Amino acid sequence: MATSLAAQLAQIAAKSRSSLNVKAQKAAHTKSLIFEPRIAAGQSYQTIYTACRDGFEELCQLDARFTPFSNTLFSEQSQDEDRSQMTQAENKELDRRVDSFLRLVGSRLRLMPAIKAIEWLIRRFRIHEFNTSTLLATFLPYHSIPAFVTLLSILPADLPQQYKFLAPYVRSLTAPPRAAIVYQATHHREFLTAITEYTLDACRNKQQYPALVSFWAGVMTEAVNGRIDINRSGRQGVQLDNDLALIALVSKPLGDAMTMKDVPDIQIAAYMVVSLLAAKANFDDKLLSVFMEQLVIGWTAETVRPGLVCLSILAQYRAPKQLSSRVAKALLKMDDLPQRLVDASKQCRVDKLAYALVLALADRLAKKGDARGLPIIKSILLLELLQEKLGKVAFKSLLRAALKMTDEVDQDGSARKQLGSTLVLLSQSAGATGVMVRQVIEDEDYDIEGLELRLDTSFGPRRLLEDKPAEEDAKDLEVRQDPKETLEAAIERLAVPPRSVKSFLSQKSDQLFDDMCKVLLSVATDPDDLLKFDEAPFLCRQTAHDDSYYFSFYMRVWCGPYPTLIRSAALEMAKRRLKQGDCAALDLQAMIPYCVAALSDPAKKVRQAAADLITVLSKSNAEGIETAKRPIWASKQLYEQSNEQTWMNPAASRALLQEIIVPALEESVLDEEHISNVLRSHLQSTKDSATGPQLSSAVRLSIFSCITSHVVHTPLLAVKSRLLKPTNQVDSVSKATRTSLLLPLLRWWASLSSTEAAQLCERERIDESKFNQSCVNVAVANDKPGLETLFEIITNSSAWTREGLVEAAFARTRKIWSTIKSDSKLKLALSMLDLAQTPATAGSSAEFVSEEAADFLRNVDLTTNILNAFLESLQDIPKITTDSPATKRRRTSSSDHSRGVSLQATNAVKAALNKVTFVLQLVEGSKPAEHPELLQSLFVTLADLQVLRSQVGSELGYLQNLVLSSLLAMMPTYKNNKSLKIDTSVGHGDVLVQCIQKSSSPAVQNSALLLVASLANTAPDVVLHSVMPIFTFMGGSVLRQSDDYSAHVVVQTIKEVIPPLVETFRKSRRNLVTSAAELLSSFVIAYEHIPSHRKRDMFISLIENLGPKDFLAALVAMFVDKYGTTDSMVAFCKDLMNSFGVEVQLQSLVMLLDLVSDCLQPKPTLAATLFNRNTDDDQDLHKTALKELTLLPKVLSSRQLRTEVSQLAGRDDMEASKFRELYASLLEKILTLAETVKTNKALHARCSDTLAGLLNLLSIGEFIKAVENLLDRPSISLRQKVLRTLEVRVDQESNTDADSRTVLLAFLPQLTAVIRDSDDIAYKHTAVACVDKIAEKYGKKDLEAVAAAATTIAGDCCLGQPDKRLRVMALLCLASLVDVLQDGIVPTLPVSLPKALSYLSESLQGEKEPELHNAVYSFFESLAVHVPYMLTKTYIGQLLAVSNVSAEANMSDESSQARFGCLQLLANQVDANTMLAALEQNWAQAVNAGFSAVEEYLKLLATVLDKHPSTIIAKHISTLSTIFLSALDLRRNVQSKDTVSIAALAKLTEIEALINDVALKMIYKLNDSKFRTVFTQLMEWVATGLPKDDKLGKVLRHQSVYSFLLAFFDNLKDVVASYASYIIDDATAILKASDPSKMEDRELWQLVLKTLARCFEHDSGGFWQVPAHFEAVSGLLVEQLEHAAALGELPGGDLVQNAVVGLAEAAASRDHRKELNAAVLRRLRSPSASVRLAAVRCEQSLTDTLGEDWLEMLSEMLPYISELQDDDDEDVEKETHRWITKIEAILGESLDAMLQ
């Protein structure tokens, strides 16, 4: 029972958030988002509230929705609220407010005010404990920010179940990655549900924000995607269960999200998830349909676009069936749905959605008569949104809907009428849709005829007029609403009135025909009623052979806009009647044109019926029957003007029927266009007939005349249109043109008003535009009346209301333009120009005609005569503005008249400018190159424009550019056709100069410049006398433009103008450069204004066209003179030079040197002109010369130039020969100039630089060829410069260049000869440097030559010379040669080594010479590397001796490093025997030199010891021992001679430490037996090596030895513990004899104590436990306490204690310790207080170190301790008490009882 109760209480405690534990409460109070726990712990709620309230108020300023919380969560009262004291209802209400606030503040979490506000809720209301889920959901979208990690740090240990995945991140205090969140949402539905509910709640309360929605959408999408992948299963049952689980999880939240109309973001996010589900989840159609309905219920104007995309995706994964009524209705309400579907199709497929919509709308149409969807269906099909298969099914659904519709669902028939219009439009549409629809109509077994009757329409190619007048709609409605009339009543009604109509092909019959047609339409579907109708009296069937009444009725029907069934029935009735015998005797040719029209019917059924009719007709007109006597049927009755009708002769009638039509019947039935093609082919000339017999001209003329006559007289536009197809393709038959025969038709059609024409077309459902085209096509080019009629239509303002007809007339005229005669063309063109310039108001017919006329002129080929006439009409235009000044004066008047005149003048100017613009545009668009004769007129126009420009105050840039562009286009024609000449006397060049100079338009300037360029190339005499002002102008304008076109203009102008201009200069026999100076100056001045990316190409073009050989140098010189030798200018000049060949560049450099020489002349000629200087201004020209010379070496240093020169120099041809000549000339000139200006340092220096650059220009081989000649020159300085250049060149050469190697090695003997024979030291120096470089790079390839050079350099002629620079160079060179020759250097060493050592010694005497010093060491260093065996003991000894002096000579760091590096290398390379012997010999000298020398000596010795193995070291132990003992005697040798300073003593101590280190290095390489001998010798040496009376010497030597022993025992430790036996006697003797109060003894005394202490410390083998060893030192050591006491405050007193303690530790024997203790205790009763104090302190140390082991002898100590407690000396008493304290601490008890 107790256990159960305890468990229950534990569970309650675990779940409880209240705690009576004060520590727990304090810990909870430290949880903070902002403050550190230590700060938070000390904060009161008042403090927290004050800090957080500021943040909340800032939030209120950002968003007013936070304000209500100021009365609740952030009120003053909230400071006193405690959740633990609230009721459950109060806590629930608080949770609701907290949740609301958190959802609202989520969008501001990146702002500090939001964090502050949440801080208050955490601190006061502990929301991190009570509202953990909401708090985490609020922060989760920001899981990557630092605040989220801070939140994790304050969360309770027990997280909510859905957030337990955060536990690892809470422990590590790291932000969870997005992948972890997505994984949790994918695998744990409770987490996904939690964030979904949080997000949707925020949206419902309008508290959402983009970051939250985006986070939810991303996680939801990835989670759903992951769940789909996880749930996939091969077992259908398992897959179904998984799908149901997924549906249960996401369907409701997604449905809720999609219906939140106020939150478009969440809707779009839901669309994304739904799209994913549809694409991957394989849901059934029912669920997809539900999603579709939810989507359309909720979408808004903002979300309809993405919603439509989502809907399309859903439909795509759904079976292809119609949409639900709700979805279809929603789509039906959408504006511009087809276009939206097109837009959506760019993102996804929409075909299934469009298909399902069409099915749904068709179903609504059939069941409800709802025709609102028809426009949508029509657009979907026409826009080809459906695949062909779906499109066919969709169209079939429309046909089925049409068949299903009844009067019940469509009472007024409007829906069926709209459906019929839609079906007809689709069937007649162009493109893939029309083809597909027509195929469906033909392939499917539909009752199309019945459908046409049902819909009151016809499926054909004629366009339906969509809008009928309202009156007709009303009439149709009335008719439909009337009760249905019976056939009998109709027959009776129609038979009552008397017949006054003879033919239905007249206007008088229209009303009667309409009435009869209605009856026919009503009976067409019933064959019996149709026969009754046919035999009705009012049709006069019985008299059909006598009058035209019967047949004309049916002829009009089958050619009319009626259903196919009616049209075919009419043909059938006519055929039936023709079979009767009374028709056999008639010539029925009047019916043939109408039969031909029927054969062109779009309905195959009608064509078949027409073919049957023609077959019957042909039988009655068979050849066997006598046709000549047959009367022509209806020849007087058919038309109202039948007497004007032309009829065929019998032969022609028979030929038309039997030979043309009947053979083509079968194909005509299949193709409606076939009959027209057949007629055309037979009516054209006989030789063009495609097939069949050839017809005579008379027959063809008769047929053609008859058909065209029917076209003119028939009232049926359909018949006219169909018969015009073949006739309009026949220009003429015999002498009769189609225009002469059909012109009445065109005139009749043109005479109609727009209303009349529209009514006629509407009645017969004819496309008016096509009929207009057919009518105007009757006019042909060679028929004047036809052309005049077209002109009349175009120019007659009364016809302008027929815009379609006028447009067709323009189009026809444009089409026949090329075949119109020239005079007619000119007349027509001028008329068109007048029409194009006719003033008109906007939107008027006149404006339309004006635009058409202008368009006509723009699109026809205008002849030269026409264009010239146009231009001539412009020549008086400048006169228009001559009254402008008066006009301006009259403007000051207030009279209306003056204002009218002003306005009139302004309008006239405007009209004139419009005409000029139009004409010039026509000229430009007419390919001016094909009309070169216009050039003169265009120049006149350009001149007139200059006048007009100044008068109207406008630039007229566009007009000028039109003229200039036309002139430019003509230039190639003039250039290619030499027969065309340009008149040079007219002054075209002056006009262009004026145009260029006075125009501010860059386009005009560019065009004019291009024209100047073209003229300069084509006819230079026209413009060359005017070009200089043009170039001056270019420098200030066009050159500064940055566009590509301006750059092209400049280049083109340069290309075309400059060459002929230069040729003119050449002919003038003046200096070419001087003549062009002004031209060059204009370009140079413009340089800084030219865009940087244009400069190079433009100036290269300029130079190329001027001639680079003549002008490159001049232009570069002017650049440098004008802009100086800045980096940018030098780079530009180098670039210019590099753009040309080597020959040109060298020639230019020669010219530059000539120009510089001219500048330095007393009376310069070319330079003064070129640089525009006064010849008296010498200083200015000298500055210019300096600039030019500054440029030269920089040009010569061009890498590109060097490359080209190297390629050229290797050849042996004329070009290479020319190059060498130029090179020689350039070299000669620079040398001459250098000699001339040697008094001017600046100029001379530039000459030297130029010379160096010139010499560097050649390859090393070619260069040496030049050098060999130059070395024979008498000028030493020149030869020296050449060799210096060679040195630099060698340094630059590649090691792998075989050619360079061969040449340079071959040159070595010559350099050797220079060194040997020359008396000039500087020259020798340079030669040695050259040898050094050559040998270093290539010496190994010719050791013999290098050895010879080395011998020479080592000899007296070089190394033996007194010049120190030469010595340095020789030594450095020898060092390099050692590297090359190695053993081969040996022969020179007997000569060079003594000199080198001598020079080293000299370098340290007097004024030091570090260069020589370092050179010697460099030489020895090379020897040490390559021939160390040649360095004997003598040489090394001498070197070490001099090095000792160097070490003490205070040389620079560089010199010291050179010396020490060399010595170190010697120590490593030279044999140990030689090196150690030299070192042994050199010790005394090093000591005499100084401490630095000794220090280097010891370092060298250390290097030797490190370098050689122990076997070598052991062999030389004797030498090393000697050196070692000498080193240990250093202190005695130094201190015994003179008084030594403190600094010297310190240095001596450092050196002794170094000696000890070196000695240890030696010891490490010796075995015990070898070293014991050395050690024994050492101890003997220190003990007996000096006379007894040399006490100071002995002390100093002992100091050095014991310093070594201290290091020895300290480093080798217990390994050498036994060596202590060798020092016991000596050490005890020293301790006995030493008086530490004396400074010289005290140092040794301290060293001995330290050494003994180290021996004691490292005794691990029991050496000091041996009684003899212990007793030898124990008593003596204790006695030293008295010496330590005597020292007082002097250093060293504690050493005795350390030694005693060490001995006590090492002894490790009770007896030894007791003996030692007794000896110390005896000192406690010493009469000297200082001795007692020292003994007490010694006991303290022993007690501290040995502890209880030492206190075993406490009983012996107690009496002494007791006495010491009352010691007379206060210090002794204090130390005693301290000793007692330590004893008590160790024993753990007080000594008071023992001491009593």
Swiss-Prot record:
One of its GO terms (biological process) is maturation of SSU-rRNA from tricistronic rRNA transcript (SSU-rRNA, 5.8S rRNA, LSU-rRNA). HEAT repeats lie at residues 586-623, 656-692, 861-898, 983-1021, 1052-1089, 1161-1198, 1258-1295, 1302-1340, 1344-1383, 1492-1529, 1711-1748, 1752-1789. Gene3D superfamilies: Leucine-rich Repeat Variant. One of its GO terms (molecular function) is snoRNA binding. One of its GO terms (cellular component) is 90S preribosome. It holds the Pfam family HEAT_HEATR1. InterPro entries: ARM-like, ARM-type_fold, BP28_C_dom, HEAT_Utp10/HEAT1, U3snoRNP10_N, UTP10. Keywords: Nucleus, Repeat, Ribonucleoprotein, Ribosome biogenesis, rRNA processing. Residues 881-901 are annotated as: Disordered. Belongs to the HEATR1/UTP10 family. Component of the ribosomal small subunit (SSU) processome. Involved in nucleolar processing of pre-18S ribosomal RNA. Involved in ribosome biosynthesis. This is U3 small nucleolar RNA-associated protein 10. It comes from Pyricularia oryzae (strain 70-15 / ATCC MYA-4617 / FGSC 8958) (Rice blast fungus). The gene is UTP10.
